[in-house]
């Protein structure tokens, strides 16, 4: 949620930025009308409350003098009814303003390039050289099925499209990748390993910005009578970031760096027909997520650091990748600046996203009321939150299978994974 003071004091400027940079049309007339109603109702309720307090004292004085206070009590009742009605009207207007505010995307940082979609993202760097093969390249589907490690038919039987079953050495490599990532982030990058629920309530989803705008992208549970509704997490960012919801953090304890390995569940609404085969776009996939809660003056530095941590995974696996700065038209709803890391996928002869690292500024913190305070200070400040994939495990498996394939259909195990696979150096044939 962007700063409501910006909407009150710089509405026209904010609306223009949202239109140009986010292709978001803010209804300024409606918001202005609601804000006028809010001000009037605020004054009305405050005046009624003040008058009610004054009348209450007058009744006490009249009673002490032995006067008949019945007429005064009747007036108090009438004033109480007026106050209740005014408060209800004010609450309704505030709720409507809040709903509009929750639908507004974050404002991009000044250095984010203007653009309409991913074709206008800015490439920052490339690392590694894509391998030249002297044999016909197989895709990860063929490699996995020939190794008896990927079974998409079984996934479809058990659940439907966009599900897979992994077995044997492929399943072991998938697990090894996640363990390697966790060990790297906790032992070298300073993150605290965190285990979180895979089901979360709606307040948690509002906190990180999935609700109310992206409800159709989630898998929702059927709430039993008397129970609150839940949704399966689309990313560990949701529960991990919300650990600081409604918390005032000692600034001396910042940054807080957490990592979690979880399954992620996405309906992939709007992705019909895209990546229908293989592990690239699944309803259920594993990811190692990194989250940082930082001093609001240091979040841009933190974004560079966090992105570097994701890059380190790719570098140690010796997987060629490129780093791109997303343009305004390709950024996520709550981000003010995002880098994507795209890994080389030989069978597609292109780079595919494997990590997205974002600075959310105070957008999520305002929703969550996550604040910090320096020792001796009376005022609190909203923290800044960042998140990034470190990495998507399934897509990393795709990249390893395809980049490390051999002419006989076997796959060489990257050196950094061998300790996690009992010293195994080749899988498959």
Curated annotation (Swiss-Prot):
| Main localization, broad class | cytoplasm
Alphabetically, the GO molecular function entries are: ATP binding; serine-tRNA ligase activity
The pathway this protein participates in, as annotated, is: Aminoacyl-tRNA biosynthesis; selenocysteinyl-tRNA(Sec) biosynthesis; L-seryl-tRNA(Sec) from L-serine and tRNA(Sec): step 1/1
Give the matching InterPro entries.
Answer: aa-tRNA-synt_IIb, aa-tRNA-synth_II, aa-tRNA-synth_II/BPL/LPL, Ser-tRNA-ligase_type_1, Ser-tRNA-synth_1_N, SerRS_1_N_sf, SerRS_core, tRNA-bd_arm
* Entry GO CC: cytoplasm
User: Under which EC number(s) is this enzyme classified?
Assistant: 6.1.1.11
- Keyword tags: Aminoacyl-tRNA synthetase, ATP-binding, Cytoplasm, Ligase, Nucleotide-binding, Protein biosynthesis
Q: Nucleotide-binding as a keyword? A: yes
Q: Where in the cell is it found?
A: Cytoplasm
Question: Which GO biological process annotations does it have?
Answer: selenocysteine biosynthetic process; seryl-tRNA aminoacylation
The residues the record assigns to binding ATP are 266-268, 353-356
Residues at which L-serine binds: 235-237, 289, 389
Q: Which reaction does it catalyse?
A: tRNA(Ser) + L-serine + ATP = L-seryl-tRNA(Ser) + AMP + diphosphate + H(+); tRNA(Sec) + L-serine + ATP = L-seryl-tRNA(Sec) + AMP + diphosphate + H(+)
Cross-referenced CDD domains, in alphabetical order? SerRS_core (cd00770)
Keyword Oxidoreductase among UniProt keywords: no
What exactly does this protein do?
Answer: Catalyzes the attachment of serine to tRNA(Ser). Is also able to aminoacylate tRNA(Sec) with serine, to form the misacylated tRNA L-seryl-tRNA(Sec), which will be further converted into selenocysteinyl-tRNA(Sec).
Assembly and interaction partners: Homodimer. The tRNA molecule binds across the dimer.
In the record's own words, the domains note is: Consists of two distinct domains, a catalytic core and a N-terminal extension that is involved in tRNA binding.
Family membership = Belongs to the class-II aminoacyl-tRNA synthetase family. Type-1 seryl-tRNA synthetase subfamily.
* NCBIfam families xref list: serS (TIGR00414)
What's the protein name?
Answer: Serine--tRNA ligase
Q: Which organism is it from?
A: Haemophilus influenzae (strain PittEE)
């Amino acid at each position: 949620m962007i700063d409501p003071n910006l909407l009150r004091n710089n509405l026209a400027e904010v609306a223009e930025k949202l239109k140009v940079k986010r292709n978001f049309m803010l209804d300024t007339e409606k918001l202005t009308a609601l804000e006028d109603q809010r001000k009037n109702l605020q004054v009305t309720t405050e005046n009624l409350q003040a008058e009610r307090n004054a009348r209450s004292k007058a009744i006490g004085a009249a009673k002490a003098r032995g006067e008949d206070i019945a007429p005064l009590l009747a007036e108090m009742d009438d004033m109480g009814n007026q106050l209740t009605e005014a408060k209800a009207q004010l609450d309704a207007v505030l709720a409507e303003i809040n709903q509009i505010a929750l639908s507004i995307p974050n404002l991009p940082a000044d250095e984010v390039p203007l653009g309409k979609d991913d074709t206008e993202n800015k490439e920052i760097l490339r690392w590694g050289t894509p391998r030249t093969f002297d044999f016909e390249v197989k895709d990860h589907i063929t490699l996995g099925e020939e190794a008896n490690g990927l079974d998409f038919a079984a996934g479809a039987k058990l659940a439907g499209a966009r599900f897979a079953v992994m077995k044997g050495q492929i399943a072991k490599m998938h697990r090894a990748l996640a363990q390697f990532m966790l060990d790297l982030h906790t032992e070298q990058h300073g993150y605290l390993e965190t285990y979180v629920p895979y089901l979360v309530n709606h307040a948690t989803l509002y906190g990180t910005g999935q609700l109310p705008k992206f409800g159709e992208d989630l898998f929702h549970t059927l709430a039993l009578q008397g129970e609150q509704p839940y949704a399966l997490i689309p990313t560990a960012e949701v529960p991990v970031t919300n650990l600081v919801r409604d918390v005032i953090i000692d600034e001396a304890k910042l940054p807080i760096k957490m990592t979690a390995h979880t399954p992620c569940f996405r309906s992939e609404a709007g992705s019909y027909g895209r990546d229908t085969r293989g592990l690239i776009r699944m309803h259920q996939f594993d990811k190692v997520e990194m989250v940082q809660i930082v001093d609001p003056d240091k979040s841009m530095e933190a974004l560079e650091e966090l992105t570097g941590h994701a890059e380190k995974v790719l570098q140690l696996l010796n997987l060629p990748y490129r780093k791109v700065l997303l343009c305004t038209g390709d950024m996520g709803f709550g981000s003010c600046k995002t880098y994507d890391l795209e890994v080389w996928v030989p069978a597609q002869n292109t780079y595919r996203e494997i990590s997205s690292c974002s600075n959310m500024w105070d957008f999520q913190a305002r929703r969550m009321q996550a604040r910090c305070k320096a020792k001796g200070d009376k005022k609190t400040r909203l923290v800044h939150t960042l998140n990034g994939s470190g990495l998507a495990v399934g897509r990393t498996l795709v990249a390893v299978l395809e980049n490390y394939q051999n002419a006989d259909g076997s796959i060489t195990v990257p050196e950094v994974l061998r300790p996690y696979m009992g010293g195994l150096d080749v899988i498959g044939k």
